Amino acid sequence: MSKPVNPSQRTPLCARCRKQAVAAEYRPFCSKRCADADLGQWLKGGYVIPGAAAEQADDTAGPGAAEDDTDSH
């Protein structure tokens, strides 16, 4: 059998400031402040997933948007 792990060793570290995230309310962050700061980074474009740039389409309505317009009468 494996040895039991001390609960303080299982406690994850805050994804933002690396303190122990004790309260489960804001997990994986230690506080609302860290959670909000991380959200702000996402909203400002601070985190970017690498990959090919997406092409902008000329038709903003999407595919098939104009198909049913002629048969409406």
From Swiss-Prot:
The gene is yacG. Binds 1 zinc ion. Its cofactor is Zn(2+). Inhibits all the catalytic activities of DNA gyrase by preventing its interaction with DNA. Acts by binding directly to the C-terminal domain of GyrB, which probably disrupts DNA binding by the gyrase. Belongs to the DNA gyrase inhibitor YacG family. It comes from Hyphomonas neptunium (strain ATCC 15444). One of its GO terms (molecular function) is zinc ion binding. This is DNA gyrase inhibitor YacG. Zn(2+) binds at C14, C17, C30, C34. Keywords: Metal-binding, Zinc. Gene3D superfamilies: Erythroid Transcription Factor GATA-1, subunit A. It comes from the Bacteria. Interacts with GyrB. The keyword Lipoprotein does not apply. Residues 54-73 are annotated as: Disordered.
